Amino acid sequence: ACVLCNRVKMKGEVDAMIVGKQSILFEENVYIEETACVAGQKESEGPLGKLFDVVVEDAMAGMENWEEAESTLQQLAVDKLLEKWDGKKEDLRYIFAGDLLGQLIATSFGLMQYEIPMFGLYGACSTFGEALSLAAMTVHAGYAGHVIALASSHFASAEKQFRYPLEYGNQRPPASTWTVTGCGAAVIGTEKGEVCIRGITTGKVIDFGVKDSMNMGACMAPAAADVIAANLEDMQKDVTYYDCIITGDLGAVGKTI
């Protein structure tokens, strides 16, 4: 009887957190305890340049190929994260991480040395949002005290994977988007910090049939619009409720769409 009562209680708590069709609103706040960000030379020249923890001027990061370079970006990010964070590596229960490459090779080789249980994620440009969402759910449910959420990309490895290797010398049209060379990582936990994850809204696969592999902004814009609309509907808010609504870089074309 006690077990049944506990199950009923747990179901009630879960039901209370399920909001609308696509959202969860956590009963207890989950916090971003610390962050680390590594970027390439081109990224450092942009408006966010002064905010990056580490800037890697050598696109090869001292390695022999682009994939190894991306793995190095991940290692630099995790090392900087552990340096900044008050906790210890042994306190980390899981890593939720991913990249843009087949078989997540940058992540698999990049994070192997840390010997932390890892969930490999492939969500393309949504990977970091996916990592934050799953990390927050895991911590809130009590399955971990501290979790790393991480995602990386590299312009050259992504071009090789999805379009044309740089050595091919393909011409890029004006609407083409430029994949970031960098890595972002965060520790998610219950220790109170400046930023909390109050809830999440998970997007759906939205395909408007865009065929141009050079114009990722136009491809992603409908999905971004759909999940923003879902969040506003589920949470019963309007756009004025938020200080900022931030997406990945959709480019001028994607932003207009």
Pin down the residues of each PLM region.
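Conserved "HGTGT" condensation-loop signature of ketosynthase/thiolase-family condensing enzymes
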Residues: 6-119, 184-257
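Short, conserved acidic/polar surface loops in the N-terminal third of protein domains
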Residues: 104-110, 130-132, 158-162
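Acidic, glycine-rich active-site loops and adjacent beta-strand->loop/helix elements
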Residues: 98-103, 125-126, 151-157, 203-204
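Glycine-rich anion/phosphate-binding loop at the beta-strand->alpha-helix junction
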Residues: 126, 141-157, 161-168, 173
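Active-site-proximal alpha-helical scaffold in enzymes
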Residues: 122-149, 188, 222
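Active-site nucleophile and cofactor-binding loops and adjacent substrate-binding regions
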Residues: 66-70, 117-129, 176-178
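Glycine-/small-residue-rich "gating" segment that lines the acyl/pantetheine channel
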Residues: 21, 129-130, 160-196
